[in-house]
C-alpha cells in the first residue's frame, strides 16, 4: 500500500484494455489470403463440422477465421476480408470472414439477415 506522498510523486498506472482482435491493429477490417480452408469440431457440449480458414493478412499476421453461412466457395489463395468477432465454441477463432466481398460470394437463397451474409435482394 503506497503512502500519500508516493501517490503524489508517481500516481497510479492506468490499466490498458486488451484488444479482442489484436491482428487487425485497430482497423475495422483487414484483407488477407487463405492459406488453408478446413473444417474443425467445436468444444464439449456442441457437435458439428465448423468451416474455418487460416488467413495470412496484409500485415503479415496469420489468423484463423470463421466462414459464416451455409456453403462457401473459398479455397487456398482466395482473397478475403476479415472482421473481428470470435466464435464461442471454437478455441482460437477470433475473426470472421466478411461474405459477399472480394473472392467470398454471398450466401445463396438467403432471405433474412441478408446484409450479414452478403446476399442480394431477391427479385
From Swiss-Prot:
GO cellular component term, pick one: small ribosomal subunit
A UniProt-annotated Pfam family: Ribosom_S12_S23
Residues of the signal peptide: none
InterPro entries given in the database record: NA-bd_OB-fold, Ribosomal_uS12, Ribosomal_uS12_bac
Entry keyword set: Methylation, Ribonucleoprotein, Ribosomal protein, RNA-binding, rRNA-binding, tRNA-binding
MF terms (GO), sorted A to Z: rRNA binding; structural constituent of ribosome; tRNA binding
Residues modified to 3-methylthioaspartic acid: 89
Listed PROSITE patterns: RIBOSOMAL_S12 (PS00055)
SUPFAM superfamilies according to UniProt: Nucleic acid-binding proteins
Gene Ontology biological-process entries: translation
CDD domains, alphabetized: Ribosomal_S12
Cited NCBIfam families: rpsL_bact
Record's function text: With S4 and S5 plays an important role in translational accuracy. Interacts with and stabilizes bases of the 16S rRNA that are involved in tRNA selection in the A site and with the mRNA backbone. Located at the interface of the 30S and 50S subunits, it traverses the body of the 30S subunit contacting proteins on the other side and probably holding the rRNA structure together. The combined cluster of proteins S8, S12 and S17 appears to hold together the shoulder and platform of the 30S subunit.
Family membership noted in the UniProt record: Belongs to the universal ribosomal protein uS12 family.
UniProt subunit comment: Part of the 30S ribosomal subunit. Contacts proteins S8 and S17. May interact with IF1 in the 30S initiation complex.
Protein name: Small ribosomal subunit protein uS12
Organism: Trichlorobacter lovleyi (strain ATCC BAA-1151 / DSM 17278 / SZ) (Geobacter lovleyi)
Gene this protein is translated from: rpsL
Amino acid at each position: 500500500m503506497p503512502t500519500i506522498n508516493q501517490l503524489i510523486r508517481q500516481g497510479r498506472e492506468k490499466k490498458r484494455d486488451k484488444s479482442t482482435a489484436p491482428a487487425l491493429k485497430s482497423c475495422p477490417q483487414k484483407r488477407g489470403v487463405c492459406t488453408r480452408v478446413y473444417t474443425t469440431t467445436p468444444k464439449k457440449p456442441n457437435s458439428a463440422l465448423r468451416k474455418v480458414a487460416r488467413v495470412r493478412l496484409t500485415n503479415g499476421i496469420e489468423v484463423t477465421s470463421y466462414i459464416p453461412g451455409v456453403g462457401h466457395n473459398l479455397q487456398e489463395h482466395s482473397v478475403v476480408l476479415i472482421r473481428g468477432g470470435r466464435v464461442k465454441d471454437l478455441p482460437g477463432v477470433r475473426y470472421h470472414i466478411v461474405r459477399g466481398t472480394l473472392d467470398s460470394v454471398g450466401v445463396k437463397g438467403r432471405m433474412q439477415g441478408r446484409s450479414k451474409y452478403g446476399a442480394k435482394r431477391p427479385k
